[in-house]
Amino acid sequence: IAPERPGADAVLRFCQEHQIQTAVGHSAATFEEIKKMRAYGLGGFTHTFSGMKGFHHRELGTAGAALYFDDMICEFAKQTVSHEAFELAYRIKGSSRIVLTTDCCGLAQTQSCFDHYVRKIRFVKDRDQVCLEHYDGKKEWIDPRDYQAVKQVEMSYAQSVKNMPDHTKVGLYDIMLMTSFNPAHYIHADDCKGSIRPGMDADLTIMDQNLDLICVYCRGKEIRE
């Protein structure tokens, strides 16, 4: 939500009363506006730094608020920020206040027309391929089954996580926190998700030492394509 928009406080109150977790999204909110809205259950920042009012030493803005408030989570779609920007947040927030997310939305699998106005590309299904129609008139086609081609369109969550040790100082344990326990705790689901112990749902992602995916289990059962 953009907390500076008219009616945002009413929406936040409703969500708080119904135990719905809310977060700041693309927003031009000032530091004081976010400080005020925290009383209504505003708990974090989605896609931290992306489309947010920037930091200034006299007006911390949305980005500054994300770093300042210890009790608010910073969600990162890691592929959308520089390594240094993430490193700065990591030093300030620590591993317990960061959640790794993704903005991968399956563009290569679109079944209709998806207009990506930020990238100025339309993704159009063309039989068994996807046509990328650029606003400048250029067209290119990709095969959704071609993994290397799809990687050029958007980075998967798994690949984004895999890149972490190569480009940041974040260790494997902290990566596991940011991708499992922290998100479960953030949405109040850590009583059954986010860790491995008796009584949990046994939702497991098995990876090798290179962080390549081996298999996935949902409630103790292996998921196969």
Residue locations for each model-derived region?
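Short, surface-exposed secondary-structure boundary micro-motifs
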Residues: M207-N210
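His/Asp/Glu-enriched, well-ordered alpha-helical/loop segment
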Residues: G61-C74, R91-T102, A108-P198, L204
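Short glycine-/small-residue-rich flexible loop motifs, especially phosphate/cofactor-binding loops
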Residues: L12, I34, V161-K162, F181, ...
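Active-site core of metal-dependent hydrolases
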Residues: I1-S112
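Conserved acidic residues
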Residues: G43, D203, I214
